Amino acid sequence: MTNVICGGKPETATNKRRVCVLCGGRSGEHEISLLSARAIIEALDRARNEVIVVGIGKDGQWHLQPDPDYLQKQSDPRTIHLDPSGPRVVLSADPEMHGLLILDDNATACSLLPLDLVFPVLHGPYGEDGTVQGLLELSRIAYIGAGVLGSAVGMDKDAMKRLLRDAGIPIPDFLVVYQRKWSREAQKCQDAVWERFAPPVFVKPANLGSSLGISKVKTKSDLPRAMETAFQYDTKVLVEEGIEGREIECSVLGNDEPVASAPGEIVPRHEFYSYEAKYLDEQGAALEIPAKLSEEMTEQVRQLAVAAYRTLCCEGMGRVDFFLTRDGRLLVGEINTIPGFTKISMYPKLWEASGLSFAELLDRLIELALECHERRRRLKIEHS
């Protein structure tokens, strides 16, 4: 680990690029973030990059991890955790510092740890939603992934779907229910759902991923319980029509000229592609890579993935999820601006099937982040 000396700036032994992997977070996807970070840390080129790991606890505190390979030493995804023994740090919003302030035991800034680039491996609110991206913009630190706007609309499924719909991109029908209205007029909300849809429907928090808080409602009597489950995670909930069909995913990479990978297919063995199926049950789903699609449908998936990516102002990376109905309609379900990066995650596996290894993918993401950062740096911010 880089030596920390109060009152001074830490020195690095080499001219390597200092990359901070930021992981954990306050959301319900904390452990998933750690699993993704573990794979990224292992694959980063240590000959070119000095890897710094900062973990955000569920309480929101940031800790520099004394051993950047600490996550690698944990094998059980159910119990993976951060090392709380490292010093607390905060990211300075001062653009002259562009780094981490290391705090002493009295929570007083002790020293500065400058950063060249941050990889926010944060899934869900307080990380994937534009909040951390905004802080990094203030700090003038390059970072991987979408900017503030793309991250925010990519997190909020309501805003995302309205933008896609307005752009003419086909999506499943949906409606939004707010907690304040549900608490006053639950029956009226239920009536509105069943006037619009027939069972089954999916009920999901508007601002969460990894299938957390999502329920498949097969009967009308199950709706209240599903709504209460979703409201535990968000004050805004989506009710979406149930689509019978195949689940197709496509990875997108790039800034101004994004490119799409070969599509893949998820064949869940659970009722749907749940949190357990994604991360805890090794037999939870089969991944078909590449998906068994016609050439025409493959090209349609790739074109629509890029169109959705551009519509939602994404940069760097994104994974677009689709439904392919039995009558051949292709519908965009959502986009993930910080997709899963575990060794079994679809995003890196699709690029691997398209000829880009995990390590090469990380190198390309770093290049794209530096490209975006340089472009923003050159923008004028005052009248002259």
Feature annotation, model-predicted:
Residues 33, 171-176, 200-228, 247-249:
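Glycine-rich phosphate-binding loop of ATP-grasp-fold ATP-dependent ligases
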Residues 134-143, 219, 224, 353-356:
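A glycine- and small-aliphatic-rich helix-loop capping segment at beta-alpha/alpha-beta transitions
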